[in-house]
C-alpha cells in the first residue's frame, strides 16, 4: 500500500497577492455578455482587451482576455512577465522570434494552453479569423515591441 502525502491546510501568507479582495461576495461569476471589451493602446486599433480579474498594471495576479479580428497581426514583441494563454475561441497563431515569419507560426485550437516565459520575443496573427485568448500572469503587465515602428502607441 502506498503512503499518501497530505497537503498541509495552511492559510496563505498575509502578504500574498490575492484575487479575492476583502468585502467581495463569496462567489464572483462573469458571464460572456458581461465581458467589457476596450481598446488597448499597445494593440492594433481593431484589437480589444478585457480585464477579467485583478489589476494588470499593478503587482499581483491578473487575468485578461484578448480579442483580435481576422487578418490582424501583432508584430514581434515581448512581455516581462511569464504568461499562460488559454485559447477561448478561434485559432491562435503564435510564433517565436525577433522578426515576423509566417513559417514559424504554430496554430492552437480552442482549449489549448500555451506557457510563454517572460521576455520571450514572439508575434501573433489572426490568420484564419478572429481569436480570443485568456491570459493569466503576475503584474504589472508589460508589452515592448522590438521595433518602435510596430508599436501602435507611436502612431498617435
Feature roles, as predicted:
Residues 74-76, 94-95, 116, 121-127:
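Short beta-strand His + acidic residue motifs that chelate non-heme Fe in jelly-roll/DSBH
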Residues 69-72, 78-99:
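Glycine- and acidic-residue-biased ligand/ion/polar-headgroup-sensing regions
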Residues 57, 92, 98-119:
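Short acidic-glycine-tyrosine-enriched beta hairpin
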Residues 43-45, 56-58, 78-79, 86, ...:
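Extracellular/periplasmic catalytic domains that process cell-envelope and extracellular macromolecules
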Residues 26-28, 103, 123-156:
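Double-stranded beta-helix
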Residues 10-62, 148-156:
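A short, N-terminal "cap"/entry segment at the start of jelly-roll beta-barrel domains
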Residues 59-79, 107, 117-119:
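Conserved short histidine dyad/triad with adjacent acidic residue
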Residues 1-10:
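Polybasic, low-complexity, intrinsically disordered segments
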Amino acid at each position: 500500500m502506498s503512503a499518501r502525502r497530505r497537503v498541509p491546510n495552511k492559510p496563505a501568507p498575509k502578504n500574498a497577492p490575492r484575487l479575492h479582495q476583502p468585502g467581495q461576495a463569496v462567489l464572483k461569476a462573469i458571464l460572456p455578455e458581461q465581458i467589457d471589451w476596450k481598446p488597448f493602446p499597445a494593440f492594433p486599433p481593431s484589437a480589444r482587451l478585457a480585464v477579467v480579474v485583478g489589476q494588470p498594471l499593478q503587482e499581483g495576479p491578473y487575468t485578461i482576455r484578448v480579442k483580435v479580428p481576422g487578418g490582424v497581426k501583432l508584430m514581434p514583441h515581448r512581455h516581462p512577465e511569464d504568461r499562460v494563454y488559454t485559447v477561448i475561441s478561434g485559432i491562435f497563431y503564435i510564433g517565436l522570434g525577433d522578426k515576423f515569419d509566417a513559417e514559424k507560426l504554430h496554430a492552437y485550437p480552442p482549449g489549448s494552453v500555451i506557457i510563454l516565459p517572460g521576455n520571450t520575443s514572439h508575434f501573433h496573427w489572426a490568420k484564419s479569423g478572429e481569436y480570443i485568448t485568456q491570459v493569466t500572469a503576475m503584474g504589472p503587465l508589460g508589452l515592448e515591441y522590438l521595433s518602435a515602428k510596430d508599436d501602435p502607441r507611436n502612431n498617435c
